[in-house]
Amino acid sequence: MVVISIANQKGGVGKTTIALNLSFTLAEKGYDTLVIDLDPQFNLSFGILGMKLLDYADKNIGILLSKNSVKKKEIEESIIKINDKLDLIPSHLQLSAVEKMLVNAYAREMKLKNIINQIKENYDYIIIDNAPSLGLFLINSLVASDYIIIPCEPSYFSIAGVQLMLDTVEEIKESNLNPKLKVLGFIFNKYSKQSKIPQKRLEQLKQLYPNIPVIGVIPRTITVEKAEREGKPVFKFDANNPASVAFSELAEWVIENVK
């Protein structure tokens, strides 16, 4: 079982899109996959569940994290089966309030790890979607993860924000909260050949961090935007779309390189 965080402290880089598509694609390839929505904006949960998200006010990741101790049965009751191979623990409207409550909680950085440890034998992959900020939720996610994937896009501020994320990873490792945490690689999102800027930014990223691979380049397409609006993976719209192919290749890379 492998836990992977999709994280970047810069917003708008496509974390949720990548988390959703990677999770669905791994499941489509036959792997038991759980996606955890740890973002208070709950875009992933709302995209998949729509207004049904309101039905899970007492069964979501916020409720689990707010408890001093949580039983395996409570965790299992909060898991929503999306299909035969994909499960979801949703976010909710009140998740921001839970993060504030955690400030004074005992072993606050270990909350998510303790939850995952009770159910990890049920899955091949657990994917965590994170908020674009450094807070207790992101720290929990990094402490609970084996790997982190850092999405970025072809903008100066996105590339500059990568270093903030890498610094946070080093702090987590050096503090011994999770000394084995590894950066799996970058995903370059919203790539377009119609302008020289995306190509230039991609080369800058490779030059700045030669020891961290770019494990996926996701093209900017209208199909991705349509899929986002309906909370579906891109391959459900068009399996031959360049973005569908890119996400399939990303999943294959993860399967081959993460054990």
Swiss-Prot record:
<dbReference type="InterPro" id="IPR050678">
    <property type="entry name" value="DNA_Partitioning_ATPase"/>
</dbReference>
<comment type="similarity">
    <text>Belongs to the ParA family.</text>
</comment>
<dbReference type="Pfam" id="PF13614">
    <property type="entry name" value="AAA_31"/>
</dbReference>
<keyword id="KW-0614">Plasmid</keyword>
<dbReference type="InterPro" id="IPR025669">
    <property type="entry name" value="AAA_dom"/>
</dbReference>
<protein>
    <recommendedName>
        <fullName>Uncharacterized protein MJECL24</fullName>
    </recommendedName>
</protein>
<dbReference type="InterPro" id="IPR027417">
    <property type="entry name" value="P-loop_NTPase"/>
</dbReference>
